[in-house]
Amino acid sequence: EHFRPGHVRHQVVVGPKFLYALFNPQDQLHPVSRAFMTFVRDGDLPYRRLIVNDHIVDEAATRLKKQASMRNAASFLTTLDESTVYQFEPISEDVFDAAKATFVEWTDLDASFTDFVVAAHMDELEVDHVLTYDRHYDAFDVTTLPYRNQD
């Protein structure tokens, strides 16, 4: 029982900070994001479905436009449209309501509303891995990737 292999996850949620770094060559984490995606593309990692939702796309596209360039934002949006790996999953009203309730209740967590939406959406989709550089996700019951040293 203890040595039974775990369920292989073929899907992962892609957070806005990971996407920002991936589509902004000037970002210090761009090489890490690119390397991670190369592993995904080459089949070295089990992920075949990269999930994004409305809030993730909004935050990543807006940040790319304002802090990088419109060209980077457009490249991101075009990639989402043309890629067979990225899967857009709109959030339900139940996810929004759950995120809203948790956002209001968890007053000690300095996370964005998007973070709460993503966590609630992951719970609904039964996805427990998220690609992110956002440490706020450590407060939720999810596994963050790429792995990093815990300070």
Where are the regions that the model predicts?
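Short, well-structured N-terminal submotif of metal-dependent ribonuclease cores
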Residues: 1-52, 65-75
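Active-site neighborhoods of divalent-metal-dependent phosphate/nucleic-acid chemistry enzymes
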Residues: 89-128
